[in-house]
Amino acid sequence: MIKYSLSTMALCAAFTSSAADLELLHSFESEVYTEAQPVKSFLDEFNHPLTSGDSAFTYNIFELGVKYKGFSLGAQSRYNYVLEFDPDTALFTYLEKNDLSFEKRNYRYLLKGKQSTTHGVFLAYDIEALGNGITITPKVTYYQSAHFQDAVVDGNVFSDEIKGQLQTEYYFSRDILFKSFTPTERPDGKGYSFDLEVKWQVNDDLKLSIRAKDLINETKYDGVGFVNGFTTEVPFTEQGDSIVTEPSVRFQTSAFGGEIEYSFEHDARYYFDISYRYNDQFSFDVFTRKYNSDTFIQSNVHYHFSDNWSIFSGYETHSKAVELGITNKYFGVSVKTDKLDLDDAYYAKINWYFKFAF
C-alpha cells in the first residue's frame, strides 16, 4: 500500500512538472501597405490623388499550437500578396481609370505580383547556445496550397493607344488577368518554409534579435494554368512606301488541358530588433525590417504600470504609421496605421497573441 502511494505521488509530481512546462500558443497578424494610392483606392477605383511609390503588400498569418520544453508545434494558415510596379505604370493606370489625358510618349509598364494561400503545420525548437543568453530558433512549416498567382508583365505602352511591346509570364491557379484559362481542377500544391531567429539577452536590460522569415519558401504545384508570350509592333510598307505598324500577339497558354507543374517561391523578409529596459517604468525598442526594396524603422516607448503589464506607442518611418498596444507576458494586442480614417490609409496592421500555461 505504501509502495503504491509513493508511486502515485511520483506520477502526480511528474505530471505536474510536465504540465507546468506546457503552454498553449496563439497569434494572429495582418498588415497591408500600398504606395501610389491608399489601400481602399488601390483595390478599387484608383481615383485618389497619385503619390510616388512602386510597391504594395499584405501579409496575414494565423497560428495555434503548443510549446513544451522548447519545442513548438501547431497549425498555421497564411495569405501573402506582394506587388512591385514601376511608378510610370501607376501613372498610366491612374490616367486610364480616371479618363484623363495621356502624354504622347511610351509609358513603362512593369508589374511583378506574387500571391498565395497556404494551410499547414509548423515545428520550431529553441536552442540555448553557449549559455550566454543566446537562443537560436529554427522553424519549419509544411503546408498545402490550392491558390496562387505568379505574374510578370514587362514592357511599354504608347500613350492611350493600343501600341507597345509587352512580355508576359503568368502562372496561376485561377486566371484573373485574361479570365479565360483557369484550370478545370484546382492545382495541388505542397511546400515548405524555413524561418530562423536568433535572440541575445545581453544583460538584464538589453536584448537583441535577428529574424529571417521565409528564408526558404518553395511550393510545387501540379495542374497549373499559364499564359506566356509577348505583344509587339510589326512594321510593314503600305502603297506609297509609307511605313506603318500593327500589333502582333503571340501567346502560349494552358488551354485545352495544357496545365503544367510549377515551382513557386516567396522572397525572404528580414528583421533586426533592439529592446532596452531603462528603469522600472520605461523601456524602449528600435525595430528594423526589410521587405524587398522597402525598409521600415520603428521606435517604441513602453510604460510599465505593473510588474507584468505595459502600454506602448511607436512611430514607423516609410509607412509613417503610429502603433498603440498593450502587452504582458501572456497576452498582447496592438493596432497600427498612418490614418485614423481607414479609407485614406496607406498602411494598417492588427496583431494579437496569447500564451496559456497549464
Please tell me what each predicted stretch does.
Residues 2-8:
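Sec-dependent signal peptide recognition
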Residues 223-358:
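Outer membrane beta-barrel transmembrane domains
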Residues 21-184, 228-248, 336, 340-358:
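A subset of solvent-exposed loop/turn segments in beta-rich extracellular surface proteins, enriched
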Residues 91-96, 121, 191-193, 275, ...:
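Surface-exposed extracellular loop regions of Gram-negative outer-membrane beta-barrel proteins
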Residues 20-26, 69-75, 132-140, 194, ...:
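Transmembrane beta-strands of outer-membrane beta-barrel proteins
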Residues 14-17:
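N-terminal signal peptide c-region/cleavage motif recognized by signal peptidases
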Residues 57-59, 116-120, 189-193, 267, ...:
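Membrane-spanning beta-strands of outer-membrane beta-barrel proteins
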